[in-house]
Amino acid sequence: MNIFRFFEGRVEAALRSLEEEGVLPSGLDLTRVAVEPPRDPSHGDLSTNAAMVLAKPAGMKPRELAEQLAVKLGGEEAVTEVDVAGPGFINLRLNPAFWQARIPEILRSGPAYGASDVGAGEAVNVEYVSANPTGPMHVGHVRGAVFGDALCNLLEKVGYRVCREYYINDAGGQIEVLARSAFLRYREALGEDIGQIPEGLYPGGYLKPVGQALVAAHGRSLLEKDEPEALSIVREAAVEAMMELIRGDLGVLGIVHETFFSELALHRSGFVEQTLKVLEDKGLIYIGELEPPKGEVPDDWEARPQTLFRSTEFGDDTDRALKKSDGSWTYFAPDIAYHLDKYNRGYRTLIDVWGADHSGYIKRMRAAIAGVTDGNAEFDVKICQLVRLFRNGEPVKMSKRSGDFVTLREVVDEVGKDVVRFMMLTRKNDAPLDFDFAKVMEQSRDNPVFYVQYANARIHSVLRNVAEEGTYDLSDGALANADFTLLTDEAEMALVRLMAGFPRLVEQAALAHEPHRIAFYLDDLAAAFHGLWNKGKDDHSLRFIRADHRDVTLARLALIRSAAYVIAAGLAILGVEPTEEMR
């Protein structure tokens, strides 16, 4: 249960009661009424802004309305104290029994705790990774991949129907470079001495198997074909091989896309032209000449009449070109078509996960989607900043041009999938992230993935030891019937309150498209558990197992089993397996 939504309902009921009594006018808009944790925890457990946002439409002073509402809320069974603070905020303190009742609720839910139907089955398209199919995944791709996948998990947790999509950029200039690079490896596989890889081609050895496969499939016949025909065959084979490589790389991170959308297929279908016709019919395309941009002039800017999209009508800084001087499309045109295709497939919420180098593209894309869908699609771009790779504090140097880069598989092989996934979510996506191979494996408080997993392992160690003794029924049903009024220490109650806040945290993280909040929460939850563990070391009366007090033991076992479920629920969103035993 999201206790904050529950109390929003109680506040709303109190307001309706005041309406019936004639204190408030009927028909007030309650959409801005919220119940949240107070900024200062010493002020109470919950706080509502109801009086502040309703006073003006109600024709009352905020504090006057707050005092009347406080009387109503004070009659709630779970409320022990109501305080009107400042100009009219209302702070509530809840009785321990209300908090303690959350433990059996968590035990009944298990790892599904925190799930909700806020999304109501709405279809959401999340496009992430979409790396050019020109080689294996490298460490620069990892953050966006993990972020996008965790975001999908998060949205599904709160009831959205999510499509995990990968856009295959198989129609650009880099694919031409790939084809020529693979053709060179084909000649090498036939026994030719290709010497030094020419500047501008991909030098990585990962294309050697592509060359060998081409020889197995075609023998020497490609050498006898015209270059365009030969390169067309090589291009298709190379892209297919690279996508197979990429799927495998993503698989080691536990990432599986359900939809792969080809840019080349988009062009061949004629849908780019159809999309431009849609924009033309809406009066959003014209022939014009753009002013030169301020500062450094981009390579693709041309001082000539062009086919332009009226991007400024939707908040962009300038209108945008859709065709180049040679008659070919700019990158922008097929991107508009691709997003219209998503919209036509029934998605009204479109989320794109991009690298930091694409941040300047957001305004034009947002403008285009607003224009082509008549403003009926919600479009959100999540930018993932760079990952700086270190080893023992020293930066790891990489160059994709020279083929000297750390691959995704190398990172996962060294530290493990779960460490990689968790660490990629320990910073907000738009903040740079440092990843040190040594530090992420440290068993210390400074390593969040260890700290959270250690809390879970400690819990399972206690439960295993008790199970081996066979003196307690550790089924969830038996634990749910424990006497939770015996949990009176502030550290115990702090842990309960933190767990009770998890459903709200999940909902807010999902609506904000910010899965890193789950990682932050898990660190806080682990800290609360470890704090309780350490108190038990200093004060024997606070130990989880009390040989002299069976009922206290049962209540505490229920408490820590609940904590393990919440940890498991949070880790599942991150795509991380809970560790039950440290090795």
Swiss-Prot record:
Q: Which reaction does it catalyse?
A: tRNA(Arg) + L-arginine + ATP = L-arginyl-tRNA(Arg) + AMP + diphosphate
Please state the Enzyme Commission number of this protein.
6.1.1.19
The scientific name of the source species is Parvibaculum lavamentivorans (strain DS-1 / DSM 13023 / NCIMB 13966)
> Where does this protein reside within or beyond the cell?
Cytoplasm
Concerning Gene3D superfamilies, the annotation shows: Arginyl tRNA synthetase N-terminal domain, HUPs, Isoleucyl-tRNA Synthetase, Domain 1
Keyword check for Transport, yes or no. Answer: no
* Name assigned to this protein: Arginine--tRNA ligase
**Where would you say this protein principally sits, based on its record?**
cytoplasm
Q: Which GO terms describe its cellular component?
A: cytoplasm
* SMART domains per UniProt: Arg_tRNA_synt_N, DALR_1
